[in-house]
């Protein structure tokens, strides 16, 4: 709920910056927090609609509150916000956008999907809400997290300006029609430090072929290649029609103690997507069958070098393979048809109960909105069905697509490509992959033994190393064999002494301790005894202790899982005394003179002890 003398003036289209109050309620109408601050316009094309978005900046100078204190976004841990964005779906607004074609979800959906997919970009977190203006219902909105903000950058990445307007520690560039510096201006004069540094990087890539790995490594030290890949993949997948020359932001942190010190991308408005809106960028096609490689044809849209950099990086084999593998990692997971539709349906389910009141307030029909959502849903299904064949058609380096099945034999885990973990619990695991690129596998846990490749094609590889790289020629079954293991638990009886156990040269001092061994491995054990205790025996249920269980130094084969217990007993103690005690007499015990009494000595059981008296001359 927002209120203020002139806030309605702003939302009715007057570009003023009025003061006002914001109250934030939960779904049950319970007030969570409130404060006073400044409102300002949010949106460009969408500002022409009757239902408008706005930014809110809470100011502690008003004496009420310094930040909206609540965990607004389920995907984030942050719980204090001085600045927030409140949007009415922008250019996907229903009923106002593009002749009533909006679904009232696109922008929030793409940002949310990117977050759930853990793409290497920054997103505006989203939380659907309804808005009241001075007590009057104002419709379905989204609370959005502001990312081009030092509070955001400081909280998540420990990157911030040293002082306002400084060029140190933060460089942030934005393009919307033109390009400007958000952070990193530096001293007055032509250009900015951030722009100059970016231009230098663009020039370096243009002048130094990235097919040369040395040049590529140099570029990679300054530029987050994963962010570039994810940014181009996502915009190409959703067929964004106003990126590069609009809605493009990129930045890097300069604080050496912070994170994200390479240039990386931020998502901005993602509402002109999925064949919706005006084609401001001039992409070749906005249909579901648009080629995934279309971004490479866009010249230098926006004039900041993003596409020339992209095309140059694609000449590097490592980058190209990372790009294709990344697509398939995503296509088989968070950007799959199933997952994308699940997220869309779940987000629509949140706003659907409020859409009748939104429509009653602003116009349109419920059926019209439902049809728009159905069109969006069908477009997404058609798009994800076309992408793999589209890659094969437009990227001559790749072949396929082929089925890859990974099977784990034994107990262990394999990582395929990036973060696809296959273990003995989810094996066999089947995926679809392209040929013509390096597809990496690595055994990441368990006692790896060897690989086996079952295929109609021939592959040359070392079966005994824990990494494997395949250029697929057809369908393939990859078997990863792990040596069977047995768990041995070590214990001591009784507990509470200083005794430890030496196991293959490693001292175990915490009991019980369990160690996994390959089946039939020979294990050597011996006790390190507390001085007050002596060895009694070893106990086991199934493994055979050699030479016997009564030998302090022993070994066994890990043929079965078992508990091996070291039994110890307290040594007998002998106390020596002289009566009467006030003499110079002493006692010789095994050649050692004792002259302090009483003295207690512990001995192994049944040890022979020799004693003799050294008498005071008067006794």
Residue locations for each model-derived region?
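Short coil/turn motif common to extracellular beta-sandwich-like domains
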Residues: 399-403, 433-438, 484-487, 518-522, ...
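Conserved "repeat-terminator" motif of extracellular CCP/Sushi domains
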Residues: 400, 463-492, 548-578, 603, ...
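Short, solvent-exposed S/T- and G/P-enriched segments that are highly enriched in secreted/extracellular
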Residues: 418-438, 464-468, 505-518, 549-554, ...
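Middle-to-C-terminal accessory/interaction subdomains
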Residues: 1-15, 20-21, 30, 35-39, ...
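Conserved ATP-binding subdomain of kinase catalytic cores across diverse folds
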Residues: 2, 10-180
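Surface-exposed interfaces of beta-sheet-rich extracellular modules
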Residues: 436-464, 521-549, 582, 606-619
């Amino acid at each position: 709920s927002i209120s203020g003398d002139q806030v309605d003036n702003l939302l009715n289209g007057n570009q003023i910056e009025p003061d006002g109050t914001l109250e934030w309620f939960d779904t049950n109408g319970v007030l969570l927090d409130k404060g006073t601050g400044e409102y300002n316009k949010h949106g460009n094309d969408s500002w022409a609609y009757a239902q408008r978005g706005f930014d809110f900046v809470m100011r502690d100078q008003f004496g009420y509150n310094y930040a909206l204190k609540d965990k607004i976004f389920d995907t984030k841990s942050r719980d204090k916000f001085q600045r927030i964005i409140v949007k009415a779906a922008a250019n996907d607004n229903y009923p106002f956008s593009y002749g009533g074609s909006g679904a009232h979800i696109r922008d929030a959906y793409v940002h949310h999907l990117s977050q759930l997919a853990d793409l290497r970009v920054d997103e505006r977190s989203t939380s659907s809400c309804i808005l009241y203006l001075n007590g009057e219902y104002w419709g379905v909105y989204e609370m959005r997290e502001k990312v081009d903000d030092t509070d955001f950058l400081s909280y998540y990445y420990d990157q911030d300006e040293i002082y306002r307007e400084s060029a140190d520690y933060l460089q942030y560039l934005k393009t919307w029609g033109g390009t400007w510096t958000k952070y990193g201006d530096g001293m007055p004069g032509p250009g900015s430090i951030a722009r100059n540094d970016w231009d230098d990087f663009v020039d370096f890539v243009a002048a130094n072929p990235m097919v040369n790995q040395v040049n590529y490594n140099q570029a990679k030290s300054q530029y987050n290649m994963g962010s570039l890949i994810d940014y181009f993949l996502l915009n190409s997948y959703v067929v964004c029609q106003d990126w590069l020359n609009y809605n493009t932001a990129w930045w890097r942190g300069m604080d050496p103690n912070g994170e994200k010190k390479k240039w990386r991308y931020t998502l901005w408005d993602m509402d002109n997507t999925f064949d919706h809106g005006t084609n401001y960028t001039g992409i070749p096609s906005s249909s579901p069958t648009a080629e995934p490689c279309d971004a490479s044809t866009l010249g230098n849209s926006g004039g900041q070098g993003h596409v020339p950099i992209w095309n140059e990086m694609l000449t590097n084999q490592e980058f190209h393979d990372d790009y294709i593998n990344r697509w398939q990692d995503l296509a088989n997971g968070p950007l799959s048809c199933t997952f994308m539709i699940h997220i869309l349906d779940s987000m629509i389910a949140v706003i659907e109960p409020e859409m009748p009141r939104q429509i009653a307030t602003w116009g349109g029909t419920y059926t019209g909105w439902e049809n728009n959502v159905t069109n969006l849903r069908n477009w997404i299904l058609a798009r994800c069905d076309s992408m793999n064949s589209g890659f094969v058609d437009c990227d001559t380096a790749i072949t396929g697509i082929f089925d890859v099945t990974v099977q784990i034999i034994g107990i262990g885990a394999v990582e395929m490509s990036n973060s696809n973990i296959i273990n003995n619990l989810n094996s066999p695991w089947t995926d679809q992959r392209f040929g013509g690129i390096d597809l990496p596998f690595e055994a990441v846990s368990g006692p790896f033994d060897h690989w086996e490749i079952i295929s109609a094609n021939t592959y040359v590889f070392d079966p005994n190393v824990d990494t494997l790289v395949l250029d697929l020629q057809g369908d393939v079954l990859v078997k990863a064999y792990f040596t069977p293991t047995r768990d041995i638990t070590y214990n001591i009886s009784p507990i509470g002494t200083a005794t430890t156990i030496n196991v293959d040269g490693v001292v175990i001092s915490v009991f019980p301790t369990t160690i996994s061994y390959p089946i039939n491995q020979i294990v050597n054990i011996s006790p390190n005894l507390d001085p007050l205790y002596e060895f009694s025996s070893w106990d086991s249920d199934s493994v055979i202790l050699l030479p016997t269980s009564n030998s302090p130094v022993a070994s066994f084969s890990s043929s079965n899982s078992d508990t091996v217990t070291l039994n110890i007993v307290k040594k007998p103690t002998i106390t020596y005394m002289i009566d009467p005690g006030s003499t110079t007499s002493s006692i010789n015990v095994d050649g050692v003179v004792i002259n302090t009494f009483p003295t207690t000595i512990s001995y192994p059981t049944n040890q022979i002890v020799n004693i003799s008296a050294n008498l005071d001359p008067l006794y």
